[in-house]
């Protein structure tokens, strides 16, 4: 096993939080969000982190000051982020572009990156100190849309952590913002890709018309709530050897499937086996996020470069727990591929129309059988470079019971692969890990990275 960095404890000294406002006057106006943005399920706050080592060429330069100044300049281009969300007619969200600013926290930690362990991966110890939850800042409405904390480390590295209001953007959109911020931090006068609003492109049609059955929003037939579980948060690394072992479980005609498809089907089945559903007929749903910027869901003409709103849908694959556990891996893979095949431009429009017709239905996150998989590798958070080089880690801060998140990762041996972040009840996590161990049969358990809270 990888070192248990959760035993690491350190102190973080924070300066009082401040509001960083745009460096120049910006338009005072209201901007409507799209009907994809406006989903109930996206009215949430999402943390992300990028971590940087010391760079001798940047000696004498303060990442806090550089990023604070760059943030003010970046908000001139991304001025809606400096505003506040309000409820509009029929409860539809809109941005009041007030220019009030975003929360910024300067901090110092008495710890080095090496103390986090050889392989730097979530969940991170003391993360609540690296992204401080400012009292009164966690509202969806009438609150700052971004909270950013930059923490200097004793080794000369630093941690950039951000909490975003998910209704404003998805991972691709946030990556675009962070890269623009980093470009200005490196001395550029403006972001290489200028932001584009155009949320009307993902609004409901007039008249709205639902053209698909959207199982992802339908109430499960059996109630099985997950609220009583004590969760263990873990990370698992899948390099070429692990991914090849999974491919060998499939017949030849499926072996050429994408890495993401194969890994997702495998983890869906492993998770179901680990949960040991008592009711064999309990429904298990896999929602796989598809983005309208690329792939099957891409628009014609494409969404404009610079669009940073939410642009994804999540078609659902459905099976009983019994069938998912008793059938070979190809069964899960075929179900997932069938669900993904629905992901087209028309499907995106149908979701937007559904939000208007049905009053913003939500996902059923609290059901044991619900699982959403989000591939963040295309967001390329590790490429965000404030001048200290690329991040040694960039992406989500942890997985959740209802989701598995994929992050691009290079381990301490230089092997590139995918880090899968998830959370399960303790006993289920032990069974989940055993499923992986039994398949890979590796004596080097450090290849399967695990840490827990």
From Swiss-Prot:
Catalysed reactions listed for this entry: 13-hydroxylupanine + (2E)-2-methylbut-2-enoyl-CoA = 13-(2-methylcrotonoyloxy)lupanine + CoA
Pfam families given in the database record: Transferase (PF02458)
Gene Ontology molecular function: any one: 13-hydroxylupinine O-tigloyltransferase activity
Tissue expression remark: Expressed in roots and hypocotyls. Detected in seeds, leaves and cotyledons, but not in young developing leaves.
Entries under InterPro entries matching the protein: CAT-like_dom_sf, Plant_acyltransferase
UniProt KW Acyltransferase keyword: yes
Activity response to pH changes: Optimum pH is 8.0.
Enzyme Commission number(s): 2.3.1.93
Keywords: Acyltransferase, Transferase
Domain of life (superkingdom): Eukaryota
Sections of the chain in a coiled coil: none
Activity regulation note: Inhibited by N-ethylmaleimide, p-chloromercuribenzoic acid and diethylpyrocarbonate (DEPC).
Biological process according to GO: alkaloid biosynthetic process
Catalytic residues, chain numbering: 166 (proton acceptor), 385 (proton acceptor)
Family: Belongs to the plant acyltransferase family.
Main function: Acyl-CoA-dependent acyltransferase involved in the synthesis of lupanine alkaloids. Can use both (-)-13alpha-hydroxymultiflorine and (+)-13alpha-hydroxylupanine as substrates. Lower activity with (-)-3beta, 13alpha-dihydroxylupanine, but no activity with (+)-epilupinine and (-)-lupinine as substrates. Tigloyl-CoA, benzoyl-CoA and, more slowly, acetyl-CoA, propionyl-CoA and 2-butenoyl-CoA can act as acyl donors.
Subunit structure: Monomer.
Protein name: 13-hydroxylupanine O-tigloyltransferase
Species classification: Eukaryota, Viridiplantae, Streptophyta, Embryophyta, Tracheophyta
């Amino acid at each position: 096993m990888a070192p248990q960095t959760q035993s690491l404890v350190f102190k973080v000294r924070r300066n009082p939080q401040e509001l960083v406002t745009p460096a120049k006057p910006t338009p005072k106006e209201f901007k409507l969000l799209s009907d994809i943005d406006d989903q109930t399920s996206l009215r949430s706050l999402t943390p992300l982190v990028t971590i940087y080592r010391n760079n001798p060429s940047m000696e004498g330069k303060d990442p806090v000051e550089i990023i604070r100044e760059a943030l003010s300049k970046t908000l001139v281009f991304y001025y809606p982020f400096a505003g506040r969300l309000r409820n509009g007619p029929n409860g539809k969200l809109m941005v009041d572009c007030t220019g009030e600013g975003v929360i910024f926290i300067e901090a110092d930690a008495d710890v080095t990156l090496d103390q986090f362990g050889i392989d730097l991966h979530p969940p991170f110890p003391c993360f609540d100190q690296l992204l401080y939850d400012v009292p009164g800042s966690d509202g969806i409405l009438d609150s700052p849309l971004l909270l950013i904390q930059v923490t200097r480390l004793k080794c000369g590295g630093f941690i950039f952590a951000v909490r975003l209001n998910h209704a404003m953007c998805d991972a691709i959109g946030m990556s675009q913002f962070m890269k623009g911020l980093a470009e200005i931090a490196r001395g550029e006068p403006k972001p290489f890709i200028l932001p584009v609003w155009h949320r009307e492109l993902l609004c409901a049609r007039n008249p709205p018309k639902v053209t698909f059955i959207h199982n992802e929003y339908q109430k499960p037939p059996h109630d099985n709530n997950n609220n009583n579980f004590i969760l263990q948060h873990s990370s698992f690394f899948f390099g070429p050897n692990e991914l090849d072992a999974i491919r060998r479980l499939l017949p030849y005609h499926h072996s050429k499937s994408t890495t993401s498809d194969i890994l997702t089907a495998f983890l869906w089945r492993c998770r179901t086996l680990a949960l040991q559903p008592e009711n064999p007929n309990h429904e298990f749903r896999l929602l796989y996020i598809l983005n309208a910027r690329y792939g099957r869901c891409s628009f014609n003409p494409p969404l404009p470069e610079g669009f940073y709103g939410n642009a994804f849908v999540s078609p659902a694959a459905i099976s009983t727990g019994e069938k998912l556990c008793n059938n070979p891996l190809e069964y899960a893979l075929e179900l997932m591929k069938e669900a993904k095949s629905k992901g087209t431009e028309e499907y995106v429009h149908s979701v937007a129309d559904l939000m208007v017709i049905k009053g913003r239905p939500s996902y059923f996150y609290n059901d044991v059988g619900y699982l959403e998989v989000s591939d963040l590798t295309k967001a390329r958070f590790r490429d965000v470079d404030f001048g200290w080089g690329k991040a040694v880690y960039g992406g989500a801060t942890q997985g959740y019971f209802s989701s598995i998140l994929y992050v691009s990762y290079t381990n301490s041996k230089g092997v590139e692969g995918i880090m899968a972040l998830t959370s399960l009840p303790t006993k289920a996590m032990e069974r989940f890990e055993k499923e992986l161990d039994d398949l890979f049969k590796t004596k080097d358990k450090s290849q399967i990275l695990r840490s827990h809270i």
